[in-house]
């Protein structure tokens, strides 16, 4: 009974550990969150002059509505991040948005005003092909869902199934298009590649097959993305082999009609797949007779097919993007073109057509030199350009170009046409344009930040006055300036600081009279400087699209951005800080290593992380694939750390490669080691550097890939500091930590997927000698595994398949009560293995990311920051994951303040550091030290970005915000006044005593 009460007491004591919380008036003071939706896949703009929103579906499986006036997210629904949540199609009708996701398995209807779910149904299995609205009696009533083998009709209001019919010969025919225009029938169009097209007409009321037509098309491979239905159900397909258009009236004809393009002085581009881009403003009415023909990457033609006659309305030989839009009875064509006449070709990926838009075919497409584009509107009936509809805008980043164009058209009071345009560029930038002389770009969104792949924080530089003060104490300044010069420099520096302090005080008094919401703290990159406690830093973010950002950490303001157009999708990135701002007047320097996934080739980019400018230092040209990169503590004469690059021939390239650097590498080569991991072969190899900059294999470890595979290799952070080298135990002895900076944690997972035979293994390996320090395995466990490796401990999380729960396992390494070598660590001189303590805990939730807090000196207690699938970030004290927690408390364990062991780790809402500012689909957490030992800066990134500060041991080195300055000042003044009075009274008393 006593043990039970003691256990409860220690449990309550653990719950009383200080937590980091915020008051209501502190929300947004030290933290911020930015929400994103990702790269657009579909977009629909409401066609009304008072419309304030646009609905989008993205490649991040997000359905959202954006405020068209500000660009803010009105509502957002985030589906699963896997292929199950992918949005396959989206249609907008009135106040309803219809989406199909999960490969055609789920169809939903959303209310556009608040984002509410109207209905959701599960569709039959089968490969999804197309989605369309079906009108009947001048109203849209049904939704047609075309799959590989079936065509189904659902009620628009409820989603209930009206009928479903099997498609004839679906085994050999690829049905890809569905069409209806309110005539009581719906067509399903399929193709047998390079053979024929099959057209099946269904009755809307009962699903009966009314007609089936087979037409020979030996030149046609695909219907979708090539053909289109124009006018009253006329199928138009381009035929590159005969350089003509083939037409077929679905209602009346059974053979294709060939119309040569030579009669219109048009010609297809060589090697380019032409496309027909039709428009159907209303599902109840037939498609417009006018359509765009995409002839080559930059050549479009506006054609009209009416009563069997094809005519050219307007030719656009130099065009980037086109789009249709309708308001009332007017349909216009929007054409985007480069403003300058001189253009050049560039290479990228192929594109495809989206809803209400056209995605540029990137291969051999044209890009502007000056990055300036114009948008003009043309009346589709005549091809005449509408006056006063020209909008000109410029793109900031060179190398990028518009990729999608969406147009929102409305009628003005004078019956003229006005419009707004949504443009998406290759670097995932969203621009919303309007027709105003003063401000064309209404708002912009950097959606590439929805996929941050690596991140670093860089200290801000000193101000000019601070830099001068720093330079006063140098030896060169004393020799050059002399005593009088140094005195005058000090005097001028102090005057500058006095002026800055006076202006700062004036701003504080001026802002004190305003509400906090009205205080504008404008951040300018030219006046950016380090604050008193180094809490304000520059966040350098690299995104998957190849775009770099410089973001000020205290406000989230984007100060600079750069785009790398040559970066291909699925490339891997590694960002390294070679020189910080501590080496004035040398500018800080970051190096980005980009590796192409397909070819394996790598490239280096060197830039200034504060101003975002490319460095004048030329990086080496990498002619071989890079296997490993090392940032050494060795510096050149300009204080830049040396970067070693090891290629597939095990040759080493140094950057920078000056004489000073090569001399230092020649001296330090025997002490430079590195490792390589080949996960496919299950090999870990250790190498050492020779004096001639070649490599030598020092050890090799093979893990059988047919039994287990390597999933993660985790080392320690080079920037972390360990303050205490041991732990004081209850008997006053010291248990010394095993602080091996070369230790690697290798996580393996079984290849057998059966839940009874799965296991997770971990190896602790010395990266210099290849010695296995410790190995363990968790049977009946599987990943994904999240791991944190710091100081002398390793924490990793996995899924227990037997108990069906998430678990933590913590490992701690100790040398014992005697320290082998207290002055220097050497992996080559370690005769005894360290003691390894291990313990497991149950965690009630899966996790998305995990990282440990870090501070400047390592004095503050460590916390684990755990990102949950709900978007919350849990700050868990490392003391709760201590393998020395006893099951039965003893006198010594109480002396050490060890919490009695309990297998459950509870989640308390008070430990959430982001309260209700959740981070959707979190992928990583980054921590960085500040100038205050108590404070750790945290950035969580995923679909959103969240930045805050945490205080694992509370703020012991700075006064709190609610500190009562008035009270302490009044007490001090009172004490001084009382001292003066008491002194006077004492003097009078002594004088009176002397007279007696």
Swiss-Prot record:
Gene3D superfamilies: YVTN repeat-like/Quinoprotein amine dehydrogenase (2.130.10.10). One of its GO terms (cellular component) is EMC complex. InterPro entries: EMC1, EMC1_C, Quinoprotein_ADH-like_sf, WD40/YVTN_repeat-like_dom_sf. It comes from the Eukaryota. Residues 23-965 are lumenal. This is ER membrane protein complex subunit 1. Glycans are attached at residue 916. Residues 987-996 are cytoplasmic. Belongs to the EMC1 family. It holds the Pfam family EMC1_C. Keywords: Disulfide bond, Endoplasmic reticulum, Glycoprotein, Membrane, Signal, Transmembrane, Transmembrane helix. Part of the endoplasmic reticulum membrane protein complex (EMC) that enables the energy-independent insertion into endoplasmic reticulum membranes of newly synthesized membrane proteins. Preferentially accommodates proteins with transmembrane domains that are weakly hydrophobic or contain destabilizing features such as charged and aromatic residues. Involved in the cotranslational insertion of multi-pass membrane proteins in which stop-transfer membrane-anchor sequences become ER membrane spanning helices. Disulfide bonds join 227-237, 338-368.
């Amino acid at each position: 009974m006593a043990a039970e009460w003691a256990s409860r007491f220690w449990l309550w004591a653990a719950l009383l550990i200080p937590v980091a919380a915020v008051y209501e008036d502190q929300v947004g003071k030290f933290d911020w969150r930015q929400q994103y939706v990702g790269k657009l896949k579909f977009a629909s703009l409401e066609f009304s002059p008072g419309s304030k929103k646009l609905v989008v579906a993205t490649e991040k499986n997000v359905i959202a509505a954006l405020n068209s006036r500000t660009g803010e997210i009105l509502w957002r629904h985030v589906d699963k991040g896997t292929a199950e949540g992918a949005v396959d199609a989206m249609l907008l009708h009135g106040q309803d948005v219809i989406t199909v996701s999960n490969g055609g398995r789920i169809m939903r209807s959303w209310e556009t005003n608040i984002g509410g779910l109207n209905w959701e149904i599960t569709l039959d299995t089968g490969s999804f092909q197309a989605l369309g609205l079906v009108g009947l009696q001048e109203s849209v009533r049904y939704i047609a869902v075309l799959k590989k083998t079936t065509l189904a009709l659902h009620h628009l209001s409820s989603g209930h199934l009206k009928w479903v019919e099997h498609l004839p010969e679906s085994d050999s025919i690829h049905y890809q298009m569905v069409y209806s225009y309110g005539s009581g029938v719906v067509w399903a169009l399929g193709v047998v590649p390079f053979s024929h097209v099959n057209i099946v007409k269904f009755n809307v009321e009962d699903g009966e097959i009314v007609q089936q037509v087979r037409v020979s098309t030996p030149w046609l491979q695909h219907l979708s993305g090539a053909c289109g239905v124009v006018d009253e159900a006329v199928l138009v397909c381009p035929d590159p082999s005969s350089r003509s258009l083939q037409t077929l009236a679905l209602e009346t004809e059974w053979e294709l009609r060939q119309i040569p393009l030579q009669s219109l002085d048009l010609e297809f581009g060589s090697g380019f797949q032409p496309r027909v881009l039709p428009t159907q403003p209303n599902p109840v009415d037939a498609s417009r007779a006018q359509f765009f023909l995409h002839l080559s990457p930059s050549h479009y033609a506006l054609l009209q097919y009416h009563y069997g006659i094809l005519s050219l309305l307007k030719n656009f030989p130099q065009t980037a993007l086109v789009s249709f839009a309708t308001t009332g009875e007017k349909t216009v064509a929007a054409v985007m073109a480069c403003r300058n006449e001189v253009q050049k070709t560039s290479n990228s990926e192929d594109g495809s057509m989206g809803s209400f838009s056209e995605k540029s075919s990137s291969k051999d497409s044209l890009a502007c030199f000056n990055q300036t584009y114009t948008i003009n509107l043309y009346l589709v009936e005549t091809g005449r350009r509408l006056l006063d509809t020209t909008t000109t805008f410029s793109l900031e980043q060179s190398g990028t170009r518009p990729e999608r164009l969406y147009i929102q058209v409305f009628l003005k009071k004078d019956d003229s046409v006005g419009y707004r345009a949504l443009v998406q560029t290759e670097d995932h930038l969203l621009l919303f344009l309007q027709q105003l002389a003063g401000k064309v770009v209404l708002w912009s969104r950097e959606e590439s930040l929805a996929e941050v792949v690596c991140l670093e924080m860089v200290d801000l530089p000193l101000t000019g006055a601070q830099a001068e003060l720093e330079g006063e104490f140098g030896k060169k300044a004393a020799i050059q300036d002399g005593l009088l010069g140094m005195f005058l420099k000090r005097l001028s520096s102090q005057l500058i600081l006095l002026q800055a302090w006076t202006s700062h005080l004036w701003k504080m008094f001026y802002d004190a009279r305003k509400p906090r919401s009205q205080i504008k703290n404008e951040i300018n990159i030219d006046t950016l400087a380090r604050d008193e406690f180094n809490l304000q830093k520059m966040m350098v973010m690299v995104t998957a699209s190849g775009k770099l950002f410089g973001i000020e950490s205290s406000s989230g303001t984007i100060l600079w951005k750069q785009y790398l157009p040559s970066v291909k999708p699925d490339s891997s990135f590694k960002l390294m800080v070679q020189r910080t701002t501590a080496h004035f007047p040398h500018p800080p320097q970051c190096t980005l290593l980009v590796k192409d996934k397909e070819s394996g080739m790598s490239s280096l980019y060197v830039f200034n992380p504060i101003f975002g400018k490319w460095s004048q230092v030329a990086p080496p040209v990498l002619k071989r694939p890079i296997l490993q990169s090392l940032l050494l503590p060795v510096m050149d004469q300009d204080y830049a750390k040396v970067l070693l690059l090891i290629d597939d021939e095990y040759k080493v390239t140094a950057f920078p490669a000056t004489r000073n650097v090569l001399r230092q590498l020649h001296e330090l080569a025997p002490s430079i080691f590195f490792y390589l991991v080949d996960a496919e072969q299950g090999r870990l190899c250790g190498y050492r550097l020779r004096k001639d900059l070649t490599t030598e294999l020092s050890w090799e470890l093979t893990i059988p890939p047919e039994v287990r595979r390597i999933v993660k290799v985790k080392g320690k952070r080079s920037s972390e500091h360990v303050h205490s080298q041991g732990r004081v135990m209850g008997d006053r002895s010291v248990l010394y930590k095993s602080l091996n900076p070369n230790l690697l944690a290798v996580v393996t997972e079984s290849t057998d997927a059966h839940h009874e035979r799965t296991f997770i293994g971990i190896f602790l390996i010395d990266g210099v000698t290849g010695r296995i320090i410790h190995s363990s395995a968790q049977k009946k466990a599987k990943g994904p595994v999240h791991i944190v490796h710091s100081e002398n401990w390793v924490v990793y999380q996995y899924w227990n398949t037997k108990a069906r729960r998430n678990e933590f396992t913590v490992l701690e390494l100790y040398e014992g009560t005697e320290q082998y070598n207290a002055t220097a660590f050497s992996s080559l001189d370690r005769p005894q293995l360290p003691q390894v303590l291990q313990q497991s805990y149950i965690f009630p939730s899966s996790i998305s990311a995990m990282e440990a807090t870090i501070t400047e000196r390592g004095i503050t207690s460590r916390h684990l920051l755990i990102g949950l699938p709900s978007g919350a970030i849990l700050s868990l004290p490392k003391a709760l994951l201590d393998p020395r927690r006893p099951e039965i408390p003893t006198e010594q364990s109480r002396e050490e303040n060890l919490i009695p062991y309990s297998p459950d780790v509870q989640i308390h809402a008070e430990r959430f550091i982001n309260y209700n500012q959740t981070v959707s689909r979190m992928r990583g957490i980054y921590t960085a030290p500040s100038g205050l030992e108590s404070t750790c800066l945290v950035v969580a990134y995923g679909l959103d970005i969240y930045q805050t500060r945490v205080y694992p041991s509370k703020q012991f080195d700075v006064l709190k915000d609610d500190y009562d300055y008035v009270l302490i000042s009044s007490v001090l003044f009172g004490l001084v006044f009382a001292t003066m009075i008491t002194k006077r009274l004492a003097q009078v008393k002594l004088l009176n005593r002397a007279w007696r």
